């Protein structure tokens, strides 16, 4: 992990929040990727480490990026140049990608049943689990005859056992105690 991650994180968070608010996450990621590549250019790296005034540096950087940056992307470059932070653009991109992945996370949910479930049943399970987990859900369905009837749902460390086998096991535990 780069030493600049702590510096890059607030810029990435601000860019990501703005991108989500304006429904332009893909566009922002593309702009950041292009700008990060520009900073890796040897001549640009030399300019970034030099003693150019922030205004001059941001103007040069924006001129090099051209049409790749929209007005908001240019504003980010200006702010980062004023704070002498353009060299952390690759880390801003990396943090932006992490934020995007986290926001688009899909929960893997395992559904175990004795028989094949209908599309309607699967849709109801997806709807209920998305509501409960507050994120998109991808079902991995398995058939296990030992379940007997009902279903077992596993999502991370959460287990919902609505199977006949589970009920029988709980009943046996109660009778033995």
From Swiss-Prot:
<keyword id="KW-0139">CF(1)</keyword>
<dbReference type="GO" id="GO:0045259">
    <property type="term" value="C:proton-transporting ATP synthase complex"/>
</dbReference>
<comment type="function">
    <text>F(1)F(0) ATP synthase produces ATP from ADP in the presence of a proton or sodium gradient. F-type ATPases consist of two structural domains, F(1) containing the extramembraneous catalytic core and F(0) containing the membrane proton channel, linked together by a central stalk and a peripheral stalk. During catalysis, ATP synthesis in the catalytic domain of F(1) is coupled via a rotary mechanism of the central stalk subunits to proton translocation.</text>
</comment>
<dbReference type="GO" id="GO:0005886">
    <property type="term" value="C:plasma membrane"/>
</dbReference>
<keyword id="KW-0997">Cell inner membrane</keyword>
<comment type="subunit">
    <text>F-type ATPases have 2 components, F(1) - the catalytic core - and F(0) - the membrane proton channel. F(1) has five subunits: alpha(3), beta(3), gamma(1), delta(1), epsilon(1). F(0) has three main subunits: a(1), b(2) and c(10-14). The alpha and beta chains form an alternating ring which encloses part of the gamma chain. F(1) is attached to F(0) by a central stalk formed by the gamma and epsilon chains, while a peripheral stalk is formed by the delta and b chains.</text>
</comment>
<comment type="function">
    <text>This protein is part of the stalk that links CF(0) to CF(1). It either transmits conformational changes from CF(0) to CF(1) or is implicated in proton conduction.</text>
</comment>
<keyword id="KW-0066">ATP synthesis</keyword>
<dbReference type="InterPro" id="IPR020781">
    <property type="entry name" value="ATPase_OSCP/d_CS"/>
</dbReference>
<keyword id="KW-0472">Membrane</keyword>
<dbReference type="Pfam" id="PF00213">
    <property type="entry name" value="OSCP"/>
</dbReference>
<protein>
    <recommendedName>
        <fullName>ATP synthase subunit delta</fullName>
    </recommendedName>
</protein>
<keyword id="KW-0406">Ion transport</keyword>
<dbReference type="GO" id="GO:0046933">
    <property type="term" value="F:proton-transporting ATP synthase activity, rotational mechanism"/>
</dbReference>
<keyword id="KW-0375">Hydrogen ion transport</keyword>
<keyword id="KW-0813">Transport</keyword>
<dbReference type="InterPro" id="IPR000711">
    <property type="entry name" value="ATPase_OSCP/dsu"/>
</dbReference>
<keyword id="KW-1003">Cell membrane</keyword>
<dbReference type="InterPro" id="IPR026015">
    <property type="entry name" value="ATP_synth_OSCP/delta_N_sf"/>
</dbReference>
<comment type="similarity">
    <text>Belongs to the ATPase delta chain family.</text>
</comment>
